[in-house]
Amino acid sequence: MRKIYTSVEELIGGTPLLELRQIEQAEGLGATLLAKLEYLNPAGSAKDRVAKAMLDDAETKGLLKPGSVIIEPTSGNTGIGLAVVAATRGYRTIIVMPDTMSMERRLLMSAYGAELVLTPGAKGMAGSIEKAEELAREIPGSFIPGQFDNPANAAAHRATTGPEIWEDTQGKVDFFVAGVGTGGTITGTGEYLKAQNPNVKVIAVEPASSPLLSKGVAGPHGLQGIGANFVPKVLNTQVYDEIIPVTDEDAYAAGRQIGRKEGVLVGISSGAALWAAVQVAKRPENKGKTIVVLLPDTGDRYLSTPMFSE
């Protein structure tokens, strides 16, 4: 039976769960390890969900109208998602990002028609947010979706990602593991899963060299996409039961491993989440449990980074 879609937006969500059997075997895991493959969204990341949700919400509230200019500070994937959704709706888009983000991310956003403004990497996302706000004051009719503060971010995952995981596992999920960038994924998905079963354990993943959530200390790190060096308003700090810090090297190694063992090419933050999920799966008390790890994006936008340049 034929099914024809009329907009790329209709392809957002509904990503599959893949059991990582080769990694289970290689690591001697007694638990079942399931990966939520968010790179199968049309623009290659979980942020497609967020981009669509934030623009839908803004249009409904009258904050975004024909002729409006979208300005967003982002480390990359939200910018790519916004560029795609904005392209289908005819909005001009300006993305503000730290100059330390990968060249592939920059080129992708430009390919979808977004304009780029780069800020000093040393200032992190805070520097990009400051610049975006400055541009918004200068450009008439501009709108900042504000993924770090926008409730529509977490709401997107509460409405889609969480229910998809629950349905695909038929409610058999013991742990949910996700990195913390804006906090939208872990907040929305975690809240939904815990509402279905309060015994589901939610594990937050952060950079070991910027353990802001676990130790209150921020610092430079190589895990693009997580570890914003401030606590985002979107993040519900009550939703997670444990925080696992991951080193750059462990994240890179796990990211390479899933490509070589499972034929799944993912990005740096996916490597971090996967490494943490494997540690949870290795615990003797978790034998027979089901662990779902969310892998946020594709690896092809990181081929020039240390993860793949060995």
Place the predicted regions along the sequence by residue.
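PLP-dependent amino-acid enzyme catalytic core
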Residues: 1-310
